[in-house]
């Protein structure tokens, strides 16, 4: 395939928060100076930024890993570590971002300058100045920085065009685009000449302008991936008006009306919302001898399949070769665009809600399993977050972590599972003895 890349899978890692510091104030004439360790800085976010100058996802073919910087550690004198700069990654307009693991749509990036945080940096760990209490005025406790969010993302690029040209291969879509715009698509008398979307700007005689995309040729079964399949259909999702190009000369030996039905069936099979878009039927190649007779037959069959109260789709006879009927077609297209709103690609329920970084009540705080060597293994998102933020170089921090586990009910749950005094318990690579 050509150098157009419309999907990519990448990994992003936000920066970790900086570690908090344990320090004490030691100055002349300041007795009992107390704790003086500052907090760590926030880790950098990974932020996607829409750049209208980009046209493909090609950059992500060569660079698939994006990692933001971590925050600085806390310092003495109660000074906080510096927060890290966000890592800003440029993406083209029309990029849909999904979580690769769940398939959930995170965001749809369509406006120049639009930003979205795809991975949140961890907060800085607290220094010992934060843990001072009347009972413990000089704590030797600090927190490690919170790990930054890490995830795998699936990117899809759907080109931004107001009007999409659809039709069987070799019905004249590329020729039409080259005539009505300054685009220079590859044109040839064989199927799938167009293997990537071509985009061009149209200016009508009345001065209105809109973007037109000549999309890869569609065949029956495309919605199931046949031919160029869903690569084609992905791009038509963003168009507001569809120009359905029909070869009225039947030069390929197919019936024009059967072509019309087959293409609409594929659009409906892929996504029912594609059929909500207004469609203009473009009867192309009207300069050929058989075309007029075929057009009359087409109109007759079309009318037979609509009841008397339904409005028939507009049909515009044209010739991309001789430019017959083009001005009328473009004016009608511009008029239809003016009264057609944009279509949402995804229901709001499919989009990721505003990020929430607490712990849900239903979410298990921890899980217990047992290894083959009889070691009890603790896991779970909340537990691992507390574990990763514990400074095991300080006894008071370790004791604080033990109290947190007890408060979560870990001791009680281990006892209920049959843990005995002296049994080994493992969290990550850290092991300790269970004390009953």
Curated annotation (Swiss-Prot):
Enzyme kind, highest EC tier: hydrolase
Residues in OCT domain copies: 358-436
Function: An essential GTPase which binds GTP, GDP and possibly (p)ppGpp with moderate affinity, with high nucleotide exchange rates and a fairly low GTP hydrolysis rate. Plays a role in control of the cell cycle, stress response, ribosome biogenesis and in those bacteria that undergo differentiation, in morphogenesis control.
Domain Obg: 2-160
The keyword Hydrolase appears for this protein: yes
InterPro entries: G_OBG (IPR031167), GTP-bd (IPR006073), GTP-bd_Obg/CgtA (IPR014100), GTP-bd_prot_GTP1/OBG_C_sf (IPR036346), GTP1-OBG_CS (IPR006074), GTP1_OBG_dom (IPR006169), GTP1_OBG_dom_sf (IPR036726), OBG_GTPase (IPR045086)
Assigned EC number: 3.6.5.-
GO cellular component: cytoplasm
Encoding gene, per UniProt annotation: obg
Cofactor(s) for this UniProt protein: Mg(2+)
Name this protein carries in UniProt: GTPase Obg
Matching Gene3D superfamilies: GTP-binding protein OBG, C-terminal domain, GTP1/OBG domain, P-loop containing nucleotide triphosphate hydrolases
Residue ranges annotated for the OBG-type G domain, each copy included: 161-338
Family: Belongs to the TRAFAC class OBG-HflX-like GTPase superfamily. OBG GTPase family.
Compartmental location: Cytoplasm
Primary localisation category: cytoplasm
Quaternary state and interactors: Monomer.
């Amino acid at each position: 395939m050509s150098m157009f890349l419309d999907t990519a899978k990448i990994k992003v890692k936000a920066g970790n928060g900086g570690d908090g510091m344990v320090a004490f104030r030691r100055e002349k004439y300041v007795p009992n100076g107390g704790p003086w360790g500052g907090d760590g800085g926030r880790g950098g976010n990974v932020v996607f930024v829409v750049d209208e100058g980009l046209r493909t996802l090609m950059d992500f073919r060569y660079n698939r890993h994006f990692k933001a910087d971590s925050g600085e550690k806390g310092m003495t004198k109660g000074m906080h570590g510096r927060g890290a700069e966000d890592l800003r990654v440029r993406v083209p307009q029309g990029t849909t971002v999904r979580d690769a693991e769940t398939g959930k749509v995170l965001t749809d990036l369509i406006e120049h300058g639009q930003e979205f945080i795809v991975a949140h940096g961890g907060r800085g760990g607290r220094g010992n100045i934060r843990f001072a209490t009347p009972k413990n005025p000089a704590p030797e406790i600090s927190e490690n920085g919170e790990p930054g969010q890490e995830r795998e993302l699936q990117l899809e690029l759907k080109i931004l065009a107001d009007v999409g040209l659809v039709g069987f291969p070799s019905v004249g879509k590329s020729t039409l685009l080259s005539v009505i715009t300054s685009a220079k698509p590859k044109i040839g008398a064989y199927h799938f000449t167009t293997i990537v979307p071509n985009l061009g700007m149209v200016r009508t005689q009345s001065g209105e302008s809109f973007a037109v995309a000549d999309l890869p040729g569609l065949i029956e079964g495309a919605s199931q991936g046949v031919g160029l399949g869903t690569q084609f259909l992905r791009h038509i999702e963003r168009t507001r008006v569809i120009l359905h190009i029909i070869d009225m000369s039947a030069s390929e030996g197919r019936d024009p009306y059967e072509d019309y039905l087959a293409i609409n069936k594929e659009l409906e099979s892929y996504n029912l919302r594609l059929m909500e878009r207004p469609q203009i039927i473009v009867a192309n190649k009207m300069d050929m001898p058989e075309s007029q007779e075929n057009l009359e037959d087409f109109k007759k069959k079309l009318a037979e399949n609509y009841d008397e109260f339904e409005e028939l789709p507009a049909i515009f006879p044209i010739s991309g070769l001789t430019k017959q009927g083009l001005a009328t077609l473009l004016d009608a297209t511009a008029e239809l665009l003016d009264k057609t709103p944009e279509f949402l690609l995804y229901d709001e329920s499919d989009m990721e809600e505003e990020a929430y970084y607490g712990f849900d009540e239903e979410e298990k705080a921890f899980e217990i399993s047992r290894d083959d060597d009889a070691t009890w293994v603790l896991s779970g998102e909340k537990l691992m977050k507390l574990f990763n933020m514990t400074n095991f170089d300080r006894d008071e921090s370790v004791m604080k972590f033990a109290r947190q586990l007890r408060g979560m009910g870990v001791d009680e749950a281990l006892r209920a599972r049959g843990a005995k005094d002296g049994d080994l318990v493992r969290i990550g690579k850290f092991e300790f003895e269970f004390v009953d």
